[in-house]
Regions:
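Short, surface-exposed ligand- or partner-binding patches at beta-edge/loop junctions that are enriched
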Residues: 61
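Rhodanese-like catalytic fold shared by cysteine-dependent sulfurtransferases
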Residues: 1-19, 26-57, 66-95
Length: 95
């Protein structure tokens, strides 16, 4: 599985148009999220992943990097190109 540190991701995020998939639950997402993130909770991912463009690279984030790692595993098995954002939103809150 491809991974990126939060700091490296955030540099890209600030300068480029990225596809960011946030796999936290809806209430977590509504409390705090990065602008432009697409919320597809891990608990519903098997039913909603087909909303994603298969021709695009997707960065996947959660609170700490654990759920996003599971989501990356699932999405890569479905043929998606994904990168797990290590540290997740906890790293963002520490900025």
């Amino acid at each position: 599985m491809k991974e990126i540190t939060f700091d490296a991701f955030y540099q890209l995020y600030q300068n480029e148009q990225l596809s960011l998939v946030d796999v936290r639950e809806v209430d977590e997402f509504e409390t705090l999220h990065l602008e432009g993130a697409h919320n597809l909770p891990l608990s519903q991912l098997a039913d909603t992943y087909d909303q994603l463009d298969t021709d695009q690279l997707h960065y996947v984030i959660c609170k700490s990097g654990m759920r996003s790692a599971r989501a990356c595993q699932f999405l890569s098995e479905q043929g998606y190109e994904v990168i797990n954002v290590q540290g997740g939103m906890m790293a963002f809150e520490e900025l």
